[in-house]
Amino acid sequence: MRNGAVQQMNSNPNASLYPWSQRRLTYTTSHPSPFPRYGAAVNSVASKEGDIYLMGGLINSSTVKGDLWLVEAGGNMACYPLATTAEGPGPRVGHASLLVGNAFIVYGGDTKMEDSDVLDETLYLLNTCMSLFIGVLG
């Protein structure tokens, strides 16, 4: 260990037990927080720029969302809705996502708003450089 690491552990003896840290997100005044949210899709590893994408989910135990948010974790922790140039996956809960290079991939989840609705089996790709969603039929 380096001297700085030893000093840090000495100042906080439980540092190795609690490796998590907290940072506040910053929102623009025109956009309220998207949290709390249940069943949203979030990339498990940030992009090389530190970007985290959050799509859809359930808020207030009753409203299913299909919105897309970006958290700039590599910078000032800005959090804001991301506009796309094509229609995205739409409202859903419990879907899966993966970030591969510049593609945020979304699949599945509960998309039924009415009992007669059919589940969406389309695989969606978001080109994160162009903010463009592309649907690939399954």
What are these regions (language model features)?
Residues 1-138:
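Kelch-like beta-propeller repeat domains
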